Every structure is written in C-alpha cells, then in structure tokens.
Amino acid sequence: MEQPYSLEGRTALVTGASRGIGRSIALALGKAGAAVACVARGLDQVESAAAEIESAGGRARAYRVDVTRGEQIGAAVRHAEAALGPIDILVNNAGITLEKKTVEVSDEDWDAVLATNLTAMFRCVRAVAPGMIARGRGKVINVGSMYGRLGVPRYAAYCASKAAVDGLTRSLAAEWARHGIQVNCLAPGYMNTDIPRAAMAVPETRERLLSKIPARRLGEPAEAAALAVYLASPASDFMTGQTVYLDGGQTIAW
C-alpha cells in the first residue's frame, strides 16, 4: 500500500471545527491532503480554521451551521460538495456537555444534549451516506468519549448520549461495510482543551484528575488528530465498528 495515510483527492466535512479537538482534526486532515469543509456555530473561528488550512496550501471552506437544525446540515453538505467535491470523510465532532444532579436535569437540558451529541450526528451521517454508498467508499469518524463507557455521577445525559454514539457506530458499520464504508468512534479522555485546562489550574482538581489517568497527563488535541487521520485513511480500510479510547489508560485502570 503506497502512502497509506495520504488523503489526497479526498474531501472531508468536520463538525465542531472551530476549536479544540475538532479544529485540530480539520487542520490535520488538510495537512494530509484532504479538502476540508469546516463546520461550526461560530463563523469567525471556523473561518480561521479554514484560512489556516488554505495558508498551508490546502483547500477549505467554512460554514456556519447549527447541527441541531437538520435543514442547515443538508445545506452545508450541498454547498461543501459543490465547492470541494463529494464528501468522502465525515467527522462528527460537534457536541456539548452538562454537569448537573440528575434530579435537577430538565427535559430541556436532556433534549439539548441528545439533540447535539446524538441526533445531529445521525442527521449528518444520513446526509452524506447516499453519496458514499453510490461511490462505494467512505469514512465516518464519530467522536465519542470515555464517558460513554464510564459511570460518572452528575453526567447522566452526557454519558447516555456518548454510549448511544457507540451503538450508532456499530450499527452503521455493520450495515455499510459491504459498501466500502468504514465507521469508527474516536473516544477521547481528558484532553488539553479549554474545560480540562481550566480545571487543571486548581491544584486539588489537578491531582484528582491525574490520579485517575495511568499516563499522568492530559491528552493533546494533536494526538486525537493523528488518530483521526489514520481512521480517515486507506490504512484503516479493514477496521470498522470500533471504539478507540484515547485516554492515557483511564478506562482500563483499576
């Protein structure tokens, strides 16, 4: 297999591409040769991500999209394919979290988490899948979380949504394998992004978090991006339906 990690000639759409893991993944896919449609709610930040890809010699477009609005997802896919070509790679990264005592979680809270973390993911997949099936190839990377495997107090909605992502990933993988489409889940642990970084600034919290991670550090967004490039590349063509934990060993620690 020549250049197994090259994405030359491929087009990717990345949701939640304005910052953190999503932005790092978008930049890495662009560096690997893919044209990238960067999607997020905040236009300024997502335009910045697209501009960074283009400044490095790649092709990119930015689209302001609320992924909980199905019509906006469909429009973004149509515009991206018109500008960059058929979508070969979908990275479902957009998501929100909620920490709250379960008895205080309102219906609106619950619906908001599930709408963003699960329903929007399904709609994005549904929007790009017909083209992938017709072409006989495609890569779908659903960004989950170690919280989909762990029982974490005060995170009932978030844990449930991410566990559902695992199930969705396996079902899609089983259904579409014969069409040359691989569907996998990238499940990060604590990463060096805004919320964990702020928590690490408090000495007591830092010690508590690091004590749960055998590697004794946070993961870096660039590490998640490197894994995403692998999952998007021909090197992973025989891998599908898997949830890959990038968590410094936290989910296997006793």
Regions found by a protein language model. Give the residues of each.
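Conserved glycine-rich Rossmann-like NAD(P)H-binding loop of the short-chain dehydrogenase/reductase
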Residues: 34-48
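Short C-terminal tail/terminal secondary-structure segment
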Residues: 2-4, 150, 229, 240-254
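Substrate-binding pocket helix/loop in short-chain dehydrogenase/reductase
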Residues: 101-102, 106-114, 209
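Active-site helix of classical SDR
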Residues: 125, 161, 169
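Alpha-helical segment proximal to the catalytic Tyr-Lys
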Residues: 130, 174-178, 237
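Conserved glycine-rich cofactor-binding loop
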Residues: 11, 18-19
